[in-house]
Amino acid sequence: MIKNSVMTVQIKYFASLRDRLGRAEDRFSVAETTTVAEIWAGLWPETPLPPNTLAAVNMEYASLEQTVRDGDEVAFFPPVTGG
């Protein structure tokens, strides 16, 4: 029998997402095959991911379909512009 292990990831929120959610970070336990999008849905089931939100895993841009590993840091942030 194959059993999914449970992992813990750290979640960080930046800029307007941090303000909207009222917190800067979370810790979340997930199964081995969990994606970045599933993390958001698990933490915020009543709050859809805002359009154009970017994600990073371990400080590198990531797609919402990327799976995470134990101990990963997942960050969500709005698009960044500058001048």
List each model region and its residues.
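Ubiquitin-like/PB1-type beta-grasp interaction modules and other compact soluble beta-rich domains
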Residues: M1-G82
